[in-house]
Amino acid sequence: MEPTGIVVLDKPKGWTSHDCVHQMRKWFQTRKVGHTGTLDPEVDGVLPICIGKATKVVKYMSDYDKTYIGEVTFGVATTTEDAHGEVVEEKRVNKPFTRTEIEALLQAFIGKIEQTPPYYSAVKVNGKRLYEYARAGIEVERPTRTVEIKALTLTEITTAKPGCFSFAFSVTCTKGTYIRTLAVDIGKKAGYPAHMSKLTRTASGPFTQADAIPLSAFAEMSLDERLNKLRPLDTALQHFPRVTADKELEKRIRNGAVLEKSASFGDGRFLFYNEQGDCLALYQAHPTKAGLIKPETLFCHV
């Protein structure tokens, strides 16, 4: 039987998200593996990876809010907006900022904001990724995007090299937010070039660092031990309401039937479970037929 479930991985620094997917394909002996939100190589932390038929839920996990802890450094800007790029601007910070000043700066970024993705990013413009233009030395107009910062807090003032100022922060944001760019924009508001000097993802939707298993620990496991670490695919769908189907309704759902809408189903998408607690399907309102609902994704044979 094909392995199916979700691995909550604690990705180490130095690995790309694709590296992790490649390794999971080897360990679980299946090609059907997908991750749910890229982490840059030098960013560590929570990376949920879907195995086997659990890849059906990747599209729902990509919309998760993410939480990070990191560090911003004022005084130096880089090509990549993080600590690994070439220095492009420097301005000495002669006087340290107070906690009150930093907290006021951060407050200005809470809510919906506009971001311009960094040149060294995977965003596509005219069919090519921005990092391809950057490596070729070609400047192009970068599209802005609206993202939402749901929480942004100062955790501590950290030690910086002479002429710089650094602080640690925690942020919760919507998908597509570039924390590197957020760090740069905070610096601009403070009047200094800046970059993101550290970053760790601590949560992706319902999956937290407390759930995550280090890659090094997976490497030491047998196949059976790895299979035991797989979480059911519906743990990724906790944000959808659930309805229990009786045996007769279960038969119809398994056949992908269009059903009459019931008041108990609510107005949005929801999950059907059978009486044994197995996740059967995600249903939605029929797009053209009022009063009916149809399956969006079937999980019956998982």
Swiss-Prot record:
Alphabetical GO biological process terms: mRNA pseudouridine synthesis; tRNA pseudouridine synthesis
Enzyme class: isomerase
EC number: 5.4.99.25
Domain of life: Bacteria
Disulfide feature: none
Hydrolase keyword on record: no
Pfam families, alphabetized: TruB_C_2, TruB_N
GO MF term list: RNA binding; tRNA pseudouridine(55) synthase activity
Active site: D40
Keyword Isomerase: yes
UniProt-listed InterPro entries: PsdUridine_synth_cat_dom_sf (IPR020103), PsdUridine_synth_N (IPR002501), tRNA_psdUridine_synth_TruB (IPR014780), TruB_C (IPR032819)
Catalyzed reactions: uridine(55) in tRNA = pseudouridine(55) in tRNA
Function summary: Responsible for synthesis of pseudouridine from uracil-55 in the psi GC loop of transfer RNAs.
Family: Belongs to the pseudouridine synthase TruB family. Type 1 subfamily.
Name of the protein: tRNA pseudouridine synthase B
Originating species: Shouchella clausii (strain KSM-K16)
Taxonomic path: Bacteria, Bacillati, Bacillota, Bacilli, Bacillales
Name of the gene this protein is made from: truB
